[in-house]
From Swiss-Prot:
Segments traversing the membrane: none
Region feature Disordered, mapped onto this chain: 1-61
Alphabetical list of SUPFAM superfamilies matching this protein: Ribosomal proteins L15p and L18e
Protein name (record): Large ribosomal subunit protein uL15
GO molecular function, one term: structural constituent of ribosome
Biased composition (Basic residues): 30-39
Cellular component terms per the entry's GO annotation: cytosolic large ribosomal subunit
Length: 148
């Protein structure tokens, strides 16, 4: 067996469907398009969402909500993830990036209270929840709010 003699297993590949190449192929004459009608013509596709003149679903349903212009996109870290750091260490943006807990700072870093922290840490972030602060301070840690 050589690399230039490798072939896929029998039945692992299919021949492509060659349409409109004679009746013997099984896909001749109408070339799998049936008889007449819009879908049999060239360029005869119907645009997405078109319902034959009936008011389409995306126009029947009301618009909802809005996007706040000043919304901040925080990188989220849960306190359960902070156990990767050694006790007494300072956890800041650089440390979180190096540990792979966040992929970027975005509009800041926010710490949430999901999970449990067992080590005393000094956490320096842009935002945090009240529960997260409670849990960090309960094990002798400290949380500081920094500006971006």
């Amino acid at each position: 067996m050589e690399l230039n003699n490798l072939k896929p297993a029998i039945g692992a590949t299919k021949d492509r469907k060659r349409i409109g190449r004679g009746t013997g192929s099984g896909h001749g004459k109408t070339a799998t398009k049936g008889h007449k009608g819009q879908k049999a013509r060239s360029g005869g596709s119907i645009k997405a969402g078109f319902e034959g003149g009936q008011m389409p679903m995306q126009r029947r349903l009301p618009k909802r909500g809005f996007t706040p212009l000043m919304r901040k996109d925080y990188a989220i870290v849960n306190i359960g993830q902070l156990d990767v750091f050694e006790s007494g260490s300072t956890v800041d943006a650089e440390a979180l990036l190096n540990a792979g807990l966040i992929s970027g700072v975005k509009d800041g870093i926010k710490v949430l209270a999901d999970g449990d922290v067992t080590k005393s840490l000094v956490v320096k972030v842009h935002k945090y929840s009240a529960k997260a602060k409670e849990k960090i301070e309960a094990v002798g840690g400290k949380i500081e709010e920094i500006t971006l």
